[in-house]
Swiss-Prot record:
Reactions listed under catalytic activity: pseudouridine(1915) in 23S rRNA + S-adenosyl-L-methionine = N(3)-methylpseudouridine(1915) in 23S rRNA + S-adenosyl-L-homocysteine + H(+)
Gene encoding the protein: rlmH
EC number, as in UniProt: 2.1.1.177
Source organism of the structure: Gloeobacter violaceus (strain ATCC 29082 / PCC 7421)
Keywords tagged on the record: Cytoplasm, Methyltransferase, rRNA processing, S-adenosyl-L-methionine, Transferase
GO molecular function, one term: rRNA (pseudouridine-N3-)-methyltransferase activity
Function comment: Specifically methylates the pseudouridine at position 1915 (m3Psi1915) in 23S rRNA.
Residues reported in the UniProt entry to bind S-adenosyl-L-methionine: L70, G99, L118, S119, K120, L121, T122, F123
Protein name, entry field: Ribosomal RNA large subunit methyltransferase H
Enzyme class: transferase
UniProt xrefs under Pfam families: SPOUT_MTase
UniProt-listed HAMAP family: 23SrRNA_methyltr_H
Amino acid sequence: MRIKLVAVGRLREEAYERACAEYARRLAAYARLELVEVRDARIADSRAGLLKEGQALLDQLHPGEHAVLLDSGGKQFTSVELADWLENHTVQEPVFIVGSSHGVAPMVRERAQMVWSLSKLTFPHELARVIVLEQLYRAVTILAGHPYHHG
């Protein structure tokens, strides 16, 4: 299984960086993981910034990849449902997209085949990356019968 996570901006907090590195290391035992960071626009005009970031995100998507946008308005899964989705979604390779703190451009939303919500709560985009990697790790361990998930 191949999984890609594309995110806007660098992780600036060391704690988030360490957590992402740990879950990426764990995931590597079960899947080929590719982590891609695109530059945040840092433009005063947020609309222009979103468009620039949006194009950078779209440039990372390739034919045969299934774009999954992370957004609070998307579909929510239990960990077991996410594992089932990963197992039954083998036709295309999933690419999970985490936008900036300003969200994503409409063109990214239009390209996404699925929108996934981690929660009804809003998280900082750096923390969202940690949660995505942890949930993906949890999902692959559920599929492998590993005891990490106790639910």
